[in-house]
UniProtKB/Swiss-Prot annotation:
Stretch list, region Disordered: 1-29, 428-458
Principal place of residence: nucleus
Gene Ontology cellular-component annotations: Ino80 complex
The protein's name in its UniProt record: Actin-related protein 8
Organism: Danio rerio
Biased composition (Low complexity): 428-438
Length: 623
């Protein structure tokens, strides 16, 4: 056999071996699936839905809409079994009001409010005319309602066809005698989980899905089968529950069928909606108040603060004050949802924060309920209209005892679906810091030539100990996380721990919360920016005179060192002359049109494959 024949034979053998390997398959190292880079594509804004879920009101609309559609965030579900007990989430009542110390705390809080009212003069330099509740009560007790119309032309929601559920305004007007339970799925900015009927996570998520799909179909005229062509921008609180956000995103993408989702924070979107680059954002909602410092589209984590009170607490306090003044509508009950709607309207109509309005004034209001005549009431009030909104600055007057009223941002508890979370990063960073420090120490230590052998032994020992360090158990990992936290500057760590222990146990007034939030910023320049622009959004502080009142309190309480640095303290309560209640939603619609938003979209297939990891990779804030 010639050399040429042998080469040809060897070539055929190699080809056969290659075919056998292909048939058997070649073992390759298993690489973890990488999160894909966001795809740049042209998106039409009229196919983007912006959703802002509040505790009391759901606001949603297309990004091209001028204003959102507002719907009461409530659902009434038909009982599944005959004789099932009726359950109803309360609108104005809450835990902590029935404590033995509640009344005393409320009275002490109102005394502080009265002292502030009497201590401040009116703009003309004259002190306010003192008015006692007894003066108003003598008049109001004599009032009897006048019948304007025997038929109110308001009817209960028709449930004769036994719908499984009704939502929004219809849910408010379900007859209490019907076999329906009423649920508000969001409470104080979080999912309303409780031990009662309909309080499980799955039940609350079902309520959310039904309310939102109803609003999309009936109010935005978007068929559910077309949601695969739409995208969604979800606005969440600054201090959020990660598990709740994860469940809502899963509902939007998997159950409802949106093609993609962007999740962003309310405070940042508030600055977008008001056209500001930097501001201390104060969001006074119905059940919670959030304070956060935003700079160039970034929310400072250390400045986030959530107060567990809002406009509904002011409404309840206003009702107590009116009762003390002989409120003529004597059948009014805080447990009745229609009475709560009436009290909310009275608060918005009568209350103010204008020190120049003093003395007794006469008012009138109407009641219009199903199966009842339209009644006209006369009402005389004095300082009650000023006292009620001032409780936002003296929350002890709410009489809430035994509840955590202030929340700061806590470290993530981790998620089983996202192993490379904050805990992992902190642990890795700590180990890298320790390793680099040890290496630097070895390099800086002089090594005599006579001990070269020992030096090599020491290096081997160091490497082996480092390998053991990488195999730390769970408890050791927790220690490292804590150690990483202490690697922060001692002053920052001390101030954060002190703040948590000092403030979470008691209720802060809005002005004190603003001062604390700004003081948590890292630099004096950032603090100066925040003092210069305080943006108030939400519907809880929409009172006449609120802008001047808040500005006066901030100026009086801000640190003296900043008074010369800050040219003026601007408090903005009506950004661009728009309704402060829709400012956050407007910011979401602006976000939909930004070029940088292209990088934030989480697509349905990506979510199904990678899950909550996508929020960490794509969210515009630190997840």
């Amino acid at each position: 056999m010639t050399q040429t024949d042998r080469d040809a034979e060897n070539g055929r053998d190699r080809e056969k071996d290659r075919e056998k390997e292909q048939q058997r398959g070649v073992k390759r190292p298993i690489m973890p699936a990488a999160v894909p880079e966001p795809v740049q594509e042209q998106i039409q804004a009229n196919f983007i839905v912006v959703i802002h879920p509040g505790s009391r009101t759901l606001r949603l609309g297309r990004a091209t809409d001028t204003l959102p559609i507002s719907v009461p965030h409530v659902i009434a579900r038909r009982h599944k079994h005959p004789g099932q007990s009726r359950y109803e989430d309360k609108c104005l009542l809450r835990e902590g009001l029935n404590s033995a110390d509640s009344n005393e705390q409320r009275q002490n809080g109102l005394k502080m409010v009265d002292q502030v009212i009497w201590s401040k003069k009116m703009s003309n330099g004259v002190r306010r005319t003192p008015v006692s509740a007894e003066q108003a009560r003598l008049y109001n007790r004599q009032i009897r309602p006048a019948v304007l119309d025997p038929n109110s032309k308001v009817s209960w929601t028709n449930t004769s066809h036994h719908p499984e559920y009704v939502v929004g305004e219809e849910a408010l007007y379900v007859n209490p005698t019907d076999c329906y339970s009423v649920h508000w799925p969001v409470c104080r900015g979080r999912l309303n989980l409780h031990s009662g009927s309909g309080g499980s996570l799955s039940a609350v998520m079902m309520d959310l899905e039904h309310i939102w799909t109803h609003a999309l179909q009936k109010l935005l005229q978007i068929p559910l089968k077309d949601l695969k062509y739409y995208r969604c921008i979800l606005l969440i609180p600054d201090i959020y529950n990660r598990q709740h956000v994860k469940e809502i995103v899963n509902m939007l993408l998997v159950k409802m069928g949106f093609s993609a989702v962007v999740v962003h924070q309310e405070s940042v979107c508030a600055t977008f909606g008001s056209g500001l680059s930097s501001a201390c954002v104060v969001d006074v909602g119905d059940q919670k108040t959030s304070v956060c410092c935003v700079e160039d589209g970034v929310s400072h984590r250390s400045s986030r603060l959530c107060l567990a009170y809002g406009g509904s607490d002011v409404t309840r306090c206003f009702f107590w004050l009116m009762q003390r003044a002989g409120f003529p509508y004597r059948d009014c009950q805080l447990g009745n949802k229609l009475d709560c709607v009436l009290l909310q309207q009275l608060k918005e109509s009568f209350c103010h924060l204008d020190q120049d309005i003093s003395g007794l004034q006469d008012h009138e209001f109407r009641t219009r309920f199903p199966d009842s005549p339209v009644l006209l009431y006369q009402l005389r009030l004095g300082d009650e209209k000023l006292q009620a909104p001032m409780t936002l600055f003296y929350p002890a007057a709410f009489g809430i005892v035994g509840q955590r009223m202030t929340s700061l941002l806590h470290r993530s508890q981790g998620d089983a679906e996202d192993p490379h979370d904050e805990h992992f990063l902190l642990t890795t960073q700590s180990k890298q810091d320790q390793s680099s420090k040890a290496s630097a120490d070895r390099k800086s230590f002089p090594k005599p030539s006579s001990f070269e052998g020992e030096s090599s032994v020491c290096e081997v020992s160091d490497r082996s100990s480092l390998g053991q360090d990488l195999d730390l158990g769970h408890s050791q990992a927790e220690c490292l996380v804590g150690g990483a936290e202490t690697e922060e500057t001692p002053s920052a760590l001390l101030s954060r721990k002190t703040a948590m222990s000092q403030f979470e146990g008691k209720a802060l007034g809005i002005d004190k919360a603003i001062l604390h939030s700004i003081d948590s910023c890292a630099s004096d320049e950032t603090k100066r920016k925040m003092y210069s622009c305080i943006l108030v959004v939400g519907g809880g502080l929409l009172f006449h005179g609120a802008q001047e009142f808040l500005q006066h309190r901030i100026l009086n309480k801000m640190p003296p060192s900043f008074r010369c640095m800050v040219e003026s303290v601007d408090v903005i309560t009506r950004p661009k002359d728009t309704d402060a209640r829709v400012c956050v939603w407007k910011g979401g619609s602006v976000l939909a049109c930004l070029d940088t938003t292209q990088e934030l979209w989480i697509h349905q297939r990506e979510w199904q494959r990678f899950g909550v990891r996508m929020l960490r990779e794509r969210a515009a804030f630190v997840w």
